[in-house]
Amino acid sequence: MKPVVWSPNAIESIQNSYNYIYTKSPQNADLVVKTLFDLGDKLNVFPEKNPIEPLYNSKEIRFFPKWNFKIVYRIEKKRIYILDVFSTYQDLKKIKF
């Protein structure tokens, strides 16, 4: 099984989401972050099952949706690399992987 590696950008995005949610509900912020990390860490179990990210239309770049978030990742030869985690409320054209 390939290891899952989180990009610095993905970690920063989760931290930013946590900070935003925390202002409204600290308990929900903890739940969201824990769930996103848990799901991301399990992407190495059949990573091809998730849809191809339409912004890139590359079979290597896929996403896992959860609530209003997308975990975007790339399937590489030796690892699963999580590129970013973002809210689907964001303007997708501003997202850079």
Each predicted region: which residue ranges?
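Generic alpha-helical secondary structure signal
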Residues: 22-26, 60, 77, 93
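Small, basic N-terminal interaction modules of short regulatory proteins
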Residues: 1-3, 8, 79, 97
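Enriched for short, Lys/Arg-rich terminal
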Residues: 66-69, 74-97
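Basic/aromatic recognition patch in beta-strand/loop cores that engages polyanionic ligands
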Residues: 48-78
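Basic, Lys/Arg-enriched alpha-helical interface segments
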Residues: 3-57
